[in-house]
Amino acid sequence: MGQGKIEMKRIEDATRRQVTFSKRRAGFLKKANELAVLCDAQVGVVVFSDKGKLFDFCSPPVILMELFHRYEITTRNTRLQETNRDDEQMVMEITRLRNEIDQLEASLRRQTGEDLSSVSTVDELSQLQLQLESSLSKVHARKDELMSQQLEDMRRMHQTVHEQNNFLCRMVTKILLLNVITIMILAAMISITHARIALDDCMQLGYIVIKQENSWRFWFI
């Protein structure tokens, strides 16, 4: 029976982890030696255990420090080549952007009339005139659009203010009408109260009070 697939995760048991490390390390260094012998390659391996113990291998006849030095020089040269290539690309991009900026500035000066010395033919002037007329037409169209929008906003604002004024007028009218009605009711109540008081006084004095049409008549008893 074949060995089952081992799940690639940290071995929690310390003893099993140490045993596995020893076996895998030996096999790994053996494979490195085979690669160096069979392929005539310079191979260097550095391994630190979880306890910090160093294990290394270097294919003869070089020593590990010589191999590290060669690695450092090679990677440094590679980084320098990549840096130089990036610098060249950056210089090319900067040059392209500068040329584009110069062209845009020259075009802007021509369109504003600040520098027409670069325009040497009638056709170029005619083309520039058409561009300016087109730009001016767009400016007028945008101006008309903004003015129409402002007028519409003012109309809506005026309509809103007018509606608010009408509402306030109706509210004020209702309040005034309610005040008048309230005053009339209070006046009527006061008149009735005074009449009742006068009637009571007359009755106490021995008068008979009879209302005839719109007048009051008193008879002494």
UniProtKB/Swiss-Prot annotation:
Alphabetically ordered keywords of this record: DNA-binding, Nucleus, Transcription, Transcription regulation
Domain called MADS-box: residue spans: 1-61
GO-annotated biological processes: positive regulation of transcription by RNA polymerase II; regulation of transcription by RNA polymerase II
Pfam family, one: SRF-TF
Localization: Nucleus
UniProt-listed Gene3D superfamilies: Transcription factor, MADS-box
Tissue expression from the record: Ubiquitous.
PANTHER family membership: SERUM RESPONSE FACTOR HOMOLOG
Listed name of the protein: MADS-box transcription factor 30
Gene: MADS30
